[in-house]
Amino acid sequence: MSEREPHPHHLRETVGGIMVALAALQFGVVIILGKQLGDVADPIPVEAMLSIRFGVSALVLAAALAATRRPLLAAEGERRGLALLAIFGYGTEATFFFLSLRHGTAAAVTLLFFLYPVVVAIFSWLAGSGRPNRLTIVALLAAMTGAAIVVVTGAGLAIEPIGILFAFTSATIYAAYLVGSDVVLRRTPALTSGMWVGAGASLGLFVWALVAGRWRLPSDGREWLAIVAMGIATAGAFFCLMEGIRRIGALRTAIVSALEPLAASLLAWLVLREVVTGGVLLGGTLILAGAITASLARRATPQEQQIP
């Protein structure tokens, strides 16, 4: 067998890493827009904002599917799994994340949430993907350490016990979502799966906002513009994330996704003129090292040497 034959496989996985990095960047854009929305005197409730954001993302992806004449429905045999991911995926994860924010600082909640790559590693192993190889473990440790440094630097850490529970529940649900997408969605196009995930999240958050008495539409054009922009960025992020999962699997997707807090910090520096500390630069370097390593690492196979 020629030594050059694996090259297309490596190219596919490199592209997968780039797609996940692009998803992290777009989610960073969403964070910055969300910060700007929260700075107004009477901001739209978070639940309502997220419902509209995910609804816009679903409409954008549906329009893309129609324009490219791709199927709106998932592949046969994957529809039930996609429905479960759509209903219990981003919507439920976001619900617990923002419940946690009511009981702790954003830095503390984000730090706990970014435990999810470890949960992904455990879930992937339980799902039969095997233990990650040494290179992936190194990437995981580097990315998580970097994310922790970025989040903690210059920010207060305070959270109540119930907030810890909510944050870890959010991380666990998101980890299950990533692994479930890796296991279930083999033949469904990324545009299709992203559309239904957005629609499910939008519906779930809409119901929650109504029940909590926190539903309202944006009050002016500025809010509408920001939320629509968030929805468009979310649509692109969903597409890139699904393509990334398909190419590099759930665990390495989780590792590369640690770029998100770094992207948010750098965008805040560019757009909001926030200060970039030495801790952010150090953490960012570790995240980049972990992301690049994860993109280059191969999936664990029976032929690969496993961690003893």
Predicted segments, located by residue:
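Cytoplasmic-side transmembrane-helix entry/capping segments in multi-pass membrane proteins
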Residues: 16-20, 76-86, 131-144, 163-167, ...
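Juxtamembrane helix-entry segments on the extracytoplasmic side of multipass membrane proteins
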Residues: 11-17, 42-51, 74-80, 152-173, ...
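Glycine-/small-residue-enriched transmembrane alpha-helix faces in small-molecule transporters
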Residues: 2-51, 156-183, 204, 306-308
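Hydrophobic/aromatic residues within transmembrane alpha-helices
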Residues: 37, 49, 53, 100, ...
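Helix-helix packing/entry segments at the starts of transmembrane helices
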Residues: 24-25, 51-52, 90, 94, ...
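Specific transmembrane alpha-helical segments of multi-pass solute transporters/efflux pumps
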Residues: 26-31, 62, 66-107, 113, ...
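Hydrophobic transmembrane alpha-helices of multi-pass small-molecule transport proteins
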Residues: 61, 123, 132-153, 171, ...
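Transmembrane alpha-helices of multi-pass small-molecule transport proteins
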Residues: 34, 42-92, 119-120, 172-180, ...
